[in-house]
């Protein structure tokens, strides 16, 4: 059984990460474990920037966005020599367990620490993209969804006033879940996501069909990286004759106080991660990652969840079918 654990946040930040850290710290202290907070993810682990946390370290953190430990992208962690330094830093402090909050890249780093250094690592899915396998939802997804829907509502006000077409670019990397959920909740007329082949002419045809039915304005939700938004807006305006404007929501989607569901999910996952570390699991095959499936906490080997065939969450085809029916 572990006696000292570390906790870090890695990669892009997500609302609810502080709640997850709090869940880990409070659950670990209740079990008599020492907890170290590692600053700025794997970079801080390499630079030996760790601090012992107590109950008061996480007081008033559950409602705060971002991550008070800080986060960073640290591609140098792929270097085995860099990982050796990180492992040395943990071993010198007697840290034998680690909770990593982040996406699949963060999971990969945790798995290597387990396989190379014997550290018992558990990953928690912290990303607004909802693109991590092994879980129905990631920490931060529902807060980002609220942010996107609020933006869509505001754009609808001005689009309807000017009989304008608005294109909204939503984060998600190579996963369309955030765009899809926002399109349904925001009543978007059209949607473009990575899981479904996107062609400009098909989108224009749908918009023209809407205009023919008397539609005077429209909202198009599109996942980032699918097209250049300004160029697409000009193309739609040229083909339809309707004024068209693009809006890139950007990093505002990552900020803000986490909504209640994200706070609950993060707290449950944090406590569950500590339970895993306290149990007699076999870590010879690597670390574990936590998920929620049908509202129940589950875990799986990290190696399974980051395997190429499982590297992202399953496409919510039923959501897409629903969205299409409502256009």
Swiss-Prot record:
Question: Where on this chain does ATP bind?
Answer: 12, 73-74, 103-106
Q: In which pathway does it act?
A: Carbohydrate degradation; glycolysis; D-glyceraldehyde 3-phosphate and glycerone phosphate from D-glucose: step 3/4
Catalytic activities: beta-D-fructose 6-phosphate + ATP = beta-D-fructose 1,6-bisphosphate + ADP + H(+)
The protein's matches in SUPFAM superfamilies, at most eight in alphabetical order, are given as: Phosphofructokinase
Q: What is its main location?
A: cytoplasm
Q: Where is the active site?
A: 129 (proton acceptor)
Protein activity control: Allosterically activated by ADP and other diphosphonucleosides, and allosterically inhibited by phosphoenolpyruvate.
Q: What is its EC number?
A: 2.7.1.11
**Cofactor needs:** Mg(2+)
GO cellular component, alphabetical, reads:
6-phosphofructokinase complex
Which BP terms from GO are recorded? canonical glycolysis; fructose 1,6-bisphosphate metabolic process; fructose 6-phosphate metabolic process
Q: What EC class is this?
A: transferase
Q: Which amino acids does the record list as binding substrate?
A: 127-129, 164, 171-173, 224, 245, 251-254
What this chain does, per the entry, is described as: Catalyzes the phosphorylation of D-fructose 6-phosphate to fructose 1,6-bisphosphate by ATP, the first committing step of glycolysis.
- What protein is this chain from? ATP-dependent 6-phosphofructokinase
Organism of origin = Yersinia pestis (strain Pestoides F)
What is the primary gene name for this protein? pfkA
